[in-house]
Amino acid sequence: MVSTKFLNKLKNEYNIEFNNEKLLEEAFTHSSYSNEHPDDGIRDYEKLEFLGDAVLELAVSNYLYRHYPKLNEGELTRLRSNIVRTEGFSEFAIECGFQKEIHLGNGEEKAGARNRKTLLEDVFEAFNGALFLDQGMPAVERFLHLTVYPLIAKGEFDDSRDYKTDLQELLQQNGPVNIEYSVISESQLPSHFVVELKINDQVQTQGEGHNKKAAEQQAAKAALQKFE
């Protein structure tokens, strides 16, 4: 069973209460657990993952179409790909408290599967598949408005410009320059990184993001605005 603490988190932070809690249990059940505990009668999350993958792609596509009217089809596709890749959804799974609720078989638990990014991505997709079946697309959209969409709006998935490369090329026009990125703050719940950018050992800017890469890009972007 999922914990009471987690159910309260869903209710208080995301305003989610499942009508059919068996769907929620299924969303967090790995095949290794269901194989080891057949008498529990809980299916694994693979079919919900299949559904959730399609639900999330549709929801994100709809959001991008409505909020980024100036992007062409190729740019929208690239941005959507950045959002739905493994690393992004795995971090959301951790932030939402899914990681601790996953039911794993003994072998997978010992192998560290609970920290495996691909598994966490699967669980995030399965949860959204379960939420879709339980309450429909509007509930999924409300959940994403509290989790995924704010980071899209902040530009954390936009790689249309590589600020780090642009900064390096700008600064090295007149010779070698030492550019250093250092993580000065990191938290997991929610995932949040602060990176400090030094140029020739002098602190220039800081950047924040949901992962190290995003924070580095934000620090480089701030430096470009400073030097351009």
Swiss-Prot record:
The active site is at residues 53, 125. Mg(2+) binds at residues 49, 122, 125. It comes from the Bacteria. Residues 207-228 are annotated as: Disordered. Transmembrane segments: none annotated. GO terms for biological process: mRNA processing; regulation of gene expression; rRNA processing; tRNA processing. Coiled coil: none annotated. It is found in: Cytoplasm. Its cofactor is Mg(2+). Residues 7-136 form the RNase III domain. Residues 216-228 have a biased composition (Low complexity). Residues 162-228 form the DRBM domain. SUPFAM superfamilies: dsRNA-binding domain-like (SSF54768), RNase III domain-like (SSF69065). It catalyses: Endonucleolytic cleavage to 5'-phosphomonoester. GO terms for cellular component: cytoplasm. GO terms for molecular function: double-stranded RNA binding; metal ion binding; ribonuclease III activity; rRNA binding. Digests double-stranded RNA. Involved in the processing of primary rRNA transcript to yield the immediate precursors to the large and small rRNAs (23S and 16S). Processes some mRNAs, and tRNAs when they are encoded in the rRNA operon. Processes pre-crRNA and tracrRNA of type II CRISPR loci if present in the organism. Belongs to the ribonuclease III family. Homodimer. This is Ribonuclease 3. It comes from Lactobacillus acidophilus (strain ATCC 700396 / NCK56 / N2 / NCFM).
